[in-house]
Amino acid sequence: MQNKQNLIWIDLEMTGLDPDTDVIIEMATIITDSELNTLAEGPVIAVHQSDETLAKMDEWNTRQHGGSGLTQRVRESTISMAEAEAQTLEFIKLWVPERSSPICGNSICQDRRFLYRHMPTLENWFHYRNLDVSTLKELAARWSPELKFKKGSTHLALDDIRESIAELRFYREHFIKP
């Protein structure tokens, strides 16, 4: 099953944007082949956080994660940050050798900052390169502004990854010239 051409897609939901003061509350992973065909979906994990930690979320995060049901899932979860890291790493080891896949997603540098701070063993599994779909989004907005990819906005980790993969397929078809 392991293949160094496979890609690891990851998305995190956090209590905010600062990895020094905010924490991960949900994570999900998907493995695709190099042609962006989904091979496997990993665990979708709500990471337990205390009510005190959740109370520190700003208005946007409180509204978004409360409305999606994520805040309640986080409260009810018994999975620690370390357990979430271990479960995710166990899954990706089945599919991708160490340091062969870039970390893939949308605005993935932000997720990588949180992994570096809170899940360093998992972060170290990735190649040092990033496959960031938002780079193509920014280029298309400037060079081909007529191209628009319509995104949803659930801000749930697995939905966000599926959307990122679909968005990259869209840019491959409509923006990247062979």
UniProtKB/Swiss-Prot annotation:
Parts forming coiled coils: none
InterPro entries: Exonuclease_RNaseT/DNA_pol3, Oligoribonuclease, RNaseH-like_sf, RNaseH_sf
EC number: 3.1.15.-
CDD domains with a match to the protein in the record: Orn (cd06135)
Gene3D superfamilies with a match to the protein in the record: Ribonuclease H-like superfamily/Ribonuclease H (3.30.420.10)
Assigned GO CC terms: cytoplasm
Cell compartments where the protein resides: Cytoplasm
One GO molecular-function entry: 3'-5'-RNA exonuclease activity
GO biological process, one term: DNA metabolic process
Residue span, Exonuclease domain: 7-168
Alphabetic keyword roster: Cytoplasm, Exonuclease, Hydrolase, Nuclease
Protein's job: 3'-to-5' exoribonuclease specific for small oligoribonucleotides.
The protein's name in its UniProt record: Oligoribonuclease
